[in-house]
């Protein structure tokens, strides 16, 4: 019999919880660690849409990237998503920054999708081990590379375009820290990709001649949800694993 704890222990073995950023929340967040698991649902976020789909599909456990409990809760009342999840009897596990850092995790999946080879970690001060990756691609014009990113991730990119030929690329799925572009540039990056970029970081990228591509938080992390599903399905082949329905949180207007 597979239990919630078994799934959590396996995730801990491939994406150790102790590699998460200090401010993060990973592991079993809601539920019974000894509950039997016959069906797991996967999603980037635990939203009301995701929970409804999980209930409809009779899942025992939801595994998400982003934690449903991130900051201390001041109340736990009916109508609160965490309360509704607990009442449903479904358990929840988060594999957040530990899976960003992991081999085969968020940033390795991004590199594979975009054809980035010979990757190494990009150090940062927030996590015990590097989250971001930097590697090589076949030389391509910056605008053409940005178009490839948009097409591959089914997104719209906002770009600080250096106009240079791109040979070395750094990636950080989700929201890369402010120093990500500077560290990447020092490591020889011609371009960086992340989900969210602040205005002053775009300005800085232009000043140092670095192509900076903002490709969307959801879009840069969501592909890794399928990867985590595959890893768990391969380990526990007697447990049914499904992707839960989750709409993109934003749409393009104009």
Predicted regions and their residues:
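Active-site catalytic microenvironments in core metabolic enzymes, especially phosphate/sugar-handling
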Residues: 1-254
């Amino acid at each position: 019999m597979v239990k919630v704890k078994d799934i959590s222990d396996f995730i801990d073995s491939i994406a150790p919880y102790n590699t998460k950023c200090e401010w993060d929340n990973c592991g079993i967040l809601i539920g019974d660690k000894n509950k039997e698991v016959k069906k797991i649902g996967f999603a980037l976020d635990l939203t009301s849409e995701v929970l409804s789909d999980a209930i409809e599909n009779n899942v025992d456990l939801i595994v998400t990237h982003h934690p449903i409990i991130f900051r201390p809760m001041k109340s736990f009342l009916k109508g609160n998503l965490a309360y509704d999840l607990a009442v449903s009897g479904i358990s929840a596990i988060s594999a957040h920054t530990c899976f960003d850092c992991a081999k085969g995790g968020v940033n390795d999946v991004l590199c594979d999708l975009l054809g980035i080879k010979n990757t190494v970690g990009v150090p940062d001060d927030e996590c015990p081990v590097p989250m971001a990756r930097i590697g090589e691609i076949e030389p391509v014009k910056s605008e053409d590379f940005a178009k490839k990113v948009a097409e591959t991730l089914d997104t719209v990119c906002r770009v600080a375009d250096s106009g240079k030929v791109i040979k070395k690329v750094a990636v950080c799925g989700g929201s890369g820290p402010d120093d990500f572009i500077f560290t990447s540039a020092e490591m020889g990056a011609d371009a960086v990709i992340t989900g969210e970029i602040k205005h002053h970081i775009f300005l800085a990228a232009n000043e140092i001649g670095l192509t900076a591509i903002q490709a969307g938080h959801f879009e840069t992390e969501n592909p890794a949800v399928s990867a985590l599903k595959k890893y768990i399905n391969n380990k526990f082949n007697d447990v049914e694993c499904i992707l839960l329905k989750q709409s993109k949180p934003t749409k393009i207007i104009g």
